[in-house]
A protein has these predicted regions:
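Hydrophobic/aromatic beta-strand elements that line small-molecule binding cavities or substrate pockets
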Residues: 105-107, 139-146
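N-terminal signal peptide c-region/cleavage motif recognized by signal peptidases
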Residues: 12-16
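Extracytoplasmic/periplasmic, Sec-exported soluble proteins
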Residues: 20-24, 42, 46, 132, ...
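Core segments of small alpha/beta cavity-forming domains
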Residues: 20-84
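Surface-exposed, charged secondary-structure patches
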Residues: 58-131
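Bacterial N-terminal signal peptides that target proteins for export
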Residues: 1-7
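Low-complexity, intrinsically disordered terminal/linker segments enriched in charged
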Residues: 114-118, 122-139, 147-148, 152-182
Length: 182
């Protein structure tokens, strides 16, 4: 009986993995599930430990770009002996400096081996004595790439338009860090 159950589970596993690999929205949810516990650490460009946790949900291209940007930032920090703040500060995976506290995946458009998913994000600040925290709500777009291991986050398009938030694309910001600290 155990043998039969094992066979059924082994046969069902590739089907479940295949279904998830074909769904960009599931990949976006997987990313935010992993990242939601990481951005609270206040890290700008994720360090090696956080990048290791994020690696399964990010594309090989974005993983490499994050590692290269982290190395460039470390070179700058060493060169100026920590006298200047990091080139990038705050949450680099969303438009808002503080990052999201909740997300909901919207529509995804898929074309060939790329997909774009809009994500409704919100940030609720911790309550302070006697005041009710007002949430910030915005939408960003995650760009995904189809890899042999399934859909992976390949870039973030900052769509919120906040006066002091991130604008453009995550990949462009990382390229700026890399170029400014060769």
């Amino acid at each position: 009986m155990k043998w039969a159950l094992t066979c059924v589970l082994l046969l069902a596993a590739p089907v479940a993995a295949s279904a998830q690999a074909e769904d960009p929205a599931a990949a976006v949810n997987a990313f935010y599930s992993v990242y939601s516990g990481q951005h609270a650490q206040g890290l700008c460009i994720p360090d090696a430990t956080v990048r290791l946790r994020l690696q399964p949900v990010l594309s090989p291209r974005l993983n490499k770009q994050l590692a290269t940007a982290a190395t460039a930032q470390a070179r700058l920090t060493a060169k100026v002996k920590n006298a200047v703040p990091p080139v990038l500060e705050g949450d680099i995976f969303s438009s808002l400096f503080e990052g999201p506290t909740a997300w909901k995946v919207g529509s995804c458009q898929q074309k060939d081996k790329a997909a774009r998913c809009s994500v409704a994000l919100s940030y609720v600040p911790p309550p302070t004595a006697g005041t009710k925290a007002k949430p910030a709500n915005w939408t960003d777009t995650l760009v995904l790439a189809a890899t042999p291991q399934g859909w992976k986050v390949d870039d973030v398009v900052y769509d919120a338009g906040f006066a002091f938030g991130n604008t453009g694309r995550l990949s462009d910001m990382l390229n700026m860090v890399i170029a400014s600290n060769p």
